[in-house]
Amino acid sequence: MNSRDSAASEITPEVLLRAYACGIFPMAESADDPSLFWVEPELRGVIPLTGFRVSSRLARTVRSDAFTVTVNQAFTAVMDGCAEPQPGREDTWINRRIRELYSGLYALGHCHSVECWQDGDLVGGLYGVSLGRAFFGESMFHRARDASKVALVHLVARLIAGGFELLDTQYVTEHLKTFGAVEIPRRRYTGLLEKALTGPAANFTRLSIDQPISGTEALAIIAERH
């Protein structure tokens, strides 16, 4: 389902959360287009947390702690990075209204960022929405090789430790397939989402955000879930 909302200003962070609970998320045609439209894909991308894959080469990079990884320390800067052109992604769907809405969710504690730093510079990261025991990955970026991949590894470790059950990637790309992402039909996705939203919520900050874990610790957490 794609339905255009010409009055994007009527969407609030609270409305956005209710939409996520129904399996719907907003997008914009471009950064210059002020309108938003709702999306509910027939096939939904997910990464099963029990089947998250890390290549041997990436595992070596993660263990080396080549990047300093932080959480919720530079949310706005991560959104800025995600809005930059990337190889294979020259245009961005992150417009001003998207920035405002997700910044609002961040203020409410329902949006989080993972950052990768090198020599004091932000070189990669990702952000997404948490609701119940579901995490909805929104976007990622990198300015240094493997930075966004390392951020994803640390995110998955945090989700597992925090009791999350569903990692929604919205769509599946060739890049995400290398981590185990798969497409599932809408009906199956709806069932997984309903389960993840029933009962106690997960805790994104169960792992301290003041003392981030090492790459070796992150990989150990992921290995325990397999």
Swiss-Prot record:
GO biological process per UniProt: protein catabolic process
Location in the cell: Cytoplasm
Claim: Membrane is one of the keywords in the record: no
Keywords from the UniProt entry: Acyltransferase, Cytoplasm, Transferase
Gene3D superfamilies from the UniProt entry: Leucyl/phenylalanyl-tRNA-protein transferase, C-terminal domain (3.40.630.70), Leucyl/phenylalanyl-tRNA-protein transferase, N-terminal domain (3.30.70.3550)
InterPro entries in the cross-refs: Acyl_CoA_acyltransferase, Leu/Phe-tRNA_Trfase, Leu/Phe-tRNA_Trfase_C, Leu/Phe-tRNA_Trfase_N
SUPFAM superfamilies, per the entry: Acyl-CoA N-acyltransferases (Nat)
One GO CC term, this protein: cytoplasm
Entry-linked PANTHER family: LEUCYL/PHENYLALANYL-TRNA--PROTEIN TRANSFERASE, LEUCYL_PHENYLALANYL-TRNA--PROTEIN TRANSFERASE
Protein family (similarity comment): Belongs to the L/F-transferase family.
NCBIfam families, per database record: aat
Cited function: Functions in the N-end rule pathway of protein degradation where it conjugates Leu, Phe and, less efficiently, Met from aminoacyl-tRNAs to the N-termini of proteins containing an N-terminal arginine or lysine.
Protein name (record): Leucyl/phenylalanyl-tRNA--protein transferase
